[in-house]
Amino acid sequence: VNRNGATLSREASQPYLVRGMVRLIRRLEATGAKVVVMRDQSTAPLTPSDCVARNIHHLRRCAFVPASRRERALELTAARRTGIKAIDAQPMFCSRRLCPAVIGDAIVNKDNYHLTATYSRTLARWMSGQLPAFGG
């Protein structure tokens, strides 16, 4: 975040990011949209699919430590402040200590941040159970 021409640290940026999320949620709700916030996976410090290709017999080398709870709390804070439902998907990607590159038979991330289509499909049933019923 830039404030008055200065680039703020990650920690100093957090209140501004939350305020921006709250404003966005309220703008979306003003249109009549039903809004749900989803906290997603930690950003991988490597490209997991490339790492898996190089370490197919040593997949643990491709795992990484998840972001701290505080780093990941921005979306949940914004949801709490607006009273909307928040879904924490982090447990679908990582344990408390480690984010594996492969879960089941699927590579989780295609790059540092985006899920593979294959792993996304494995989440469909879980996700449908998380979403509130959106009646007419």
Residue spans of the language-model regions?
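Extracellular glycan-modifying ectodomains
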Residues: 1-136
